[in-house]
């Protein structure tokens, strides 16, 4: 069991039995063996734990405090909903029991535990949280970079990256939004905007991602925001977007990053319809190196899609948006959170099966299929139909694709995770061995010595022509923190800020052009 639940003892069990839980994303019913403990911990398992052994890793991990229960008998008999306040948001989980008696037993147990813990805790700290259960999403990453460097005849196997770790410079809280001039909107999402800005003191251009704290809390995305901050700071690689600053304002979280003014790869593919196999091979090789680096640091990316692949002004890949990353997942480890973009989800994620880092290689298969075929491998207007296609439909390829390309895509888009290309312990190296990549010079690719097949025609450093005009034509302004004229009360303000106590502000010294030095012996990293 994970360390966060190591304190749980079997004598603290209040109730345990089989229940059916309704999925939060795919709204089907799933049997789980649930155990409720005195401290409010509610664990769900795919099978009943053995009595003579320690509890295994749970599939579901809830914390129920100050909870309310509601009984329902439609659309199924013996249903009940557990509601709990997480800061300003009511979180609901829906269950049904096999009988009315079992339902009543669970409701009484939940109410008893809730009443007991309500007396012990401040109501402002009550929550009901469901997390991934393998790893610690709120803990600091503890990554071993002491990989032994070995060389072989395989060019990819001997690719060594000597990465300069970013230097965290102690400084006072002097970085604020007032330090930047906002120029153009580059993108907008549910949680905020990405804006092209110029730092007043250095006159340098950056892309600043500004996230509304209120939206992060309302959507229960605090943990993902903290993860993005840690990953951005910890990871330095030529094909990952690099962080310059991260800080928080009163109502916003801000990430100041390098500006990749070549725009989204999605935009370029829309204009070209398809990419040649050679161009796809170039982008694919840079993506593979970047994902191999993340996996070596025990990070699963989980959000591979064309919209998250940018080009710099020279035409090299920059992967962006690390909010869905999962830390502390090494080879053999699995996690279970349903997350990602529907069209890019691996079958095991859709089917609610614990998954490993090979979900990233499925995502690579989807984006490379799009590049060469000009369309998604599976598409439908309704998610239900889309998920059915992803999990059951055979792949189809245009006749013009080479046998090497078909073999590569078939391997990456293998539905059985254990058989998927890249699923073994060799990870990225296994993908690199595909015949499709036989002519790739991996060391030269890493050093950016391979000429990109396409260089964006960027007219100036502030040219945003490769970004969606829907966004670049927007006025540069931030969304007010609250709807209406009402100002937050002191309690509400403290409640909001308490969510971000663990958010560390970072300042990376030096130029963002730094990333690796092939002559350094320190910090060697080998994709193995």
From Swiss-Prot:
AGC-kinase C-terminal domain mapped to chain residues: 438-515
Phenotype reported upon loss of the gene: Defective egg-laying and increased resistance to pathogens. Simultaneous knockdown of akt-1 and akt-2 result in dauer formation and a weak extension to life span.
EC number: 2.7.11.1
InterPro entries linked: AGC-kinase_C, Kinase-like_dom_sf, PH-like_dom_sf, PH_domain, PH_PKB, Pkinase_C, Prot_kinase_dom, Protein_kinase_ATP_BS
Record's keyword terms, sorted: ATP-binding, Developmental protein, Immunity, Innate immunity, Kinase, Magnesium, Metal-binding, Nucleotide-binding, Phosphoprotein, Serine/threonine-protein kinase, Transferase
Residues covered by the Protein kinase domain: 180-437
Domain of life the protein comes from: Eukaryota
Pfam families on file: PH, Pkinase, Pkinase_C
Region feature Disordered, mapped onto this chain: 121-153
Protein name: Serine/threonine-protein kinase akt-2
Name of the encoding gene: akt-2
